[in-house]
Each structure stands twice: as structure tokens, then as C-alpha cells.
Amino acid sequence: MITPKVLSGFKDRLPKDAIQKAQLLAKVSVVFQSFGFVPIETPHLEYAQTLLPDASSDIQKEIYRFKDHGDRDVALRFDLTVPLARFVSLHHQTLGMPFKRYAIGNVFRGERAQKGRYREFTQCDFDFIGSESLVCDAEIIQVIVASLKALDLEDFCVSINHRKILNGICEYFGISQVNEALRIVDKLEKIGLNGVEEELKKECGLNSNTIKELLELIQIKQNDLSHAEFFEKIAYLKDYNENLKKGIQDLERLYQLLGDLQISQNLYKIDFSIARGLGYYTGIVYETTLNEMKSLGSVCSGGRYDHLTKNFSKENLQGVGASIGIDRLIVALSEMQLLDERSTQAKVLIACMHEEYFSYANRLAESLRQSGIFSEVYPEAQKIKKPFSYANHKGHEFVAVIGEEEFKSETLSLKNMHSGMQLNCLSFLKALEIIGENDEDL
């Protein structure tokens, strides 16, 4: 006999969990659509050569790669952005530019499984393709803020940086292995200052003095400074080189745009340690953390990539986007007790006391559905205890009971499972009025 078990880093979703996830995805999808983003889908499985060029060395170690039955070198996608590059290169003639897309799907990384981190997880990506305007970068941050607020989250911060600032810092210190250095810096939260110092020595050959000065710059954060105060503080860096000058100027322009959008200033701050480990980022980058749950890591991250299609097409297309980590958000929202704990989406359970009442019960259920009330019929004529126990377990808000009197008079008795209040022999319209009083959960 086979022992039923799930691989480490993967998980089953019970009905309650699946309902919670579906509700969150529905909310963020509405936000995406409200900004004009349209949905696309790409395969879970791609040619390995499609995915590998833009994967960092750490990500390459985590990719699920194998030979298929046709002896083709294939891999499971590790994010939704690289498949987007392939998709846009293949279809850009019919898409029209600029192109705003969102995609929701599972991705796979063989990283160490831990709280809030899985080897299969869902990403919700939204991207603005075909424009280099910073208006697009500002809109992506606007969508991040709107999406988290749609999930009833208010206490979060979007940490913002620019890859040109990081490139400029590396240039200032004469670091030639820029991508490798930034990949290590991106692990600052995971491995700490000592870990970063050791890896920079080992992988990039830097000495202790250079690393100390490098980390002093990279740890510059806005913190509680106003936008004006912070830009005044870092103005001297513009004189170091063109990369630093351009990066800071872009951030100044971005902040102007975010101010025009009237996004609360406490929701975004500059943090020079934000690097984003993926090699395709070229401009503004950001990571979003929940202020009360920073140990969970970033719940939404992304940035600008101005060479999106370089591996697939001679025509270069710029892009900027972000990815919401819905699985991490579920962990956070669960701990905050902000999730629906029901195991059903039906608001009403209809219970029959006798077999011959089912035809009436089914008509009643259909009438409720046509009125926008999700309903189900308990499939067995039982003593009333069993369907009530079922309703308690599933989380139905109401149980409608059809007994002899209700059947003859074409009424129903209704019990509110939260308050315990029961009303007998109600007309359909009266029952509908009572049930519909709290229909925001539908």
C-alpha cells in the first residue's frame, strides 16, 4: 500500500485554504483590470535554453530541469517574467505596444523549504511592456499599493532602489564582477553583514577596506528623512559617476510622479541595499515588506528590465513590472486573522426532513442562486442534527429547514448559524430579505 504524502516544499490545499487563495486572487485581479492590464497564460514547462540565460547562479541551482520523452532539454518555469519575454518576442506583432499584462500561475524553485517559502508557489505578475517612461514605473508602484490595500493591508513599505546606483557604486570601487557582487548584496537580509563580507572576499576578491566602504554606501536608507532631506543627503553621490547621477535623477523623478499620484509618503522609501538577484533588472527595483512581519520577506517585488527580449529578438523591448507573492500573503493574513475561515462558498444549506421534499428544496436552492445567494442542498433526508453539524463544520451562515409544514405551505424555516436565531415558516421573499442583509461575503 502506498503511503500518502506530499513532497517537502509542496502542499495540498484544503477547501478553506483554496477558497481563501481564490478570494485573494480575485481581489488583486480586479485591481489589475482596473488599471487596464489584460490576462495572458504561458506553459509551466519551457525549453531550458529559454529560462537559463536570465537566471542568476543561485536560481540556476534551484531550477527543475530534465529531459522529456523526446529527449528535449526542458525546465519548469522559475518565474513568470522570463516566459513573458519569450511570449512578447513571439507575439509582439499582434499585441500592440505598449502592452499591459497580468499573469497568475504557479512557478517552481528548488530552494530550502521554510515558513512562507515553498518550492511550488503562485505568482501574480503585472507588467508594462514597450515604454521606457518612468510614468510606467510609478504606475507599477501605484498598483502594488492598491493591491495590498484591496487585501486589507495598510502597514507596509515599498523599498525602492535603482540598479544604476548599485552599478555606480561598484564602478566607484572598481568592481568588475558587478552582477556577482549585486547577487551577494541582495542576500544581505538572509546572510547578514558578515556573510556578505565573506562572499564578497571569496567570489569577487575584494579586500576588507573596500568591502567596509562598499557596505557603508549600500546600507544608505531613507528611514525617517523626508524625501527632500534624503535627496539632499545623497546629492554628493551624483559627482561620483554617470551611473550614480542617472540613478538618483530617476529616483527624484519617480518621487515626483508618486507625489502627483498622492500615494502616502510613509508607504515607500529608498533603500540602497535592494538589489534584486535576478540578472535582467536594469533600472528602478523594489521590494515590499509588511512592517509587522518583516521576517516573512518580500511580499511583492519587481523592477525595470530594459533588455527584456534581447535573448529572443533583435527588436529590444523595455519593460517594468512586479510580482505579488500570494502564498506569503496568505501566511501573513492568516496570522493577522484577516482571512475567511469558511470551508464553503455557499451561504445557505437547505436540509430536508423527508425524501419527498427534495424537489421543493432544489427549486428553492435554484431561486436563491438566481437571486445571487450561493446555496446547496444537503443530499440526505436526516434527523436535523446531522445537517446542522455539517453546516457548522463548513461554515454556512444559514440553514433552511424543509419539514412537513414548510413543504405544504411552500415556506421555509431559517436558522442563523452565527446568532442562533431561528424563524419558522417564512415566505421565500422574507427569507431572501434576511439572508441578503449580510451579502458582502458572497
UniProtKB/Swiss-Prot annotation:
PANTHER family with a match to the protein in the record: HISTIDINE--TRNA LIGASE, HISTIDYL-TRNA SYNTHETASE
Species whose genome carries this gene: Helicobacter pylori (strain ATCC 700392 / 26695) (Campylobacter pylori)
UniProt keyword terms in alphabetical order: Aminoacyl-tRNA synthetase, ATP-binding, Cytoplasm, Ligase, Nucleotide-binding, Protein biosynthesis
EC number: 6.1.1.21
Subcellular location(s) per record: Cytoplasm
Family: Belongs to the class-II aminoacyl-tRNA synthetase family.
Record GO terms (molecular function): ATP binding; histidine-tRNA ligase activity
Coiled coil: none
Sequence intervals crossing the membrane: none
Gene name of the encoded protein: hisS
Disulfide bonds: none
An example Gene Ontology CC term for this record: cytoplasm
GO biological process, one term: histidyl-tRNA aminoacylation
Reaction(s) the record says it catalyses: tRNA(His) + L-histidine + ATP = L-histidyl-tRNA(His) + AMP + diphosphate + H(+)
InterPro entries: aa-tRNA-synth_II, aa-tRNA-synth_II/BPL/LPL, Anticodon-bd, Anticodon-bd_dom_sf, His-tRNA-ligase, HisRS-like_core, HisRS/HisZ, HisRS_anticodon
Top-level division of the source organism's lineage: Bacteria
Pfam family, one: tRNA-synt_His
Protein name: Histidine--tRNA ligase
Assembly mode: Homodimer.
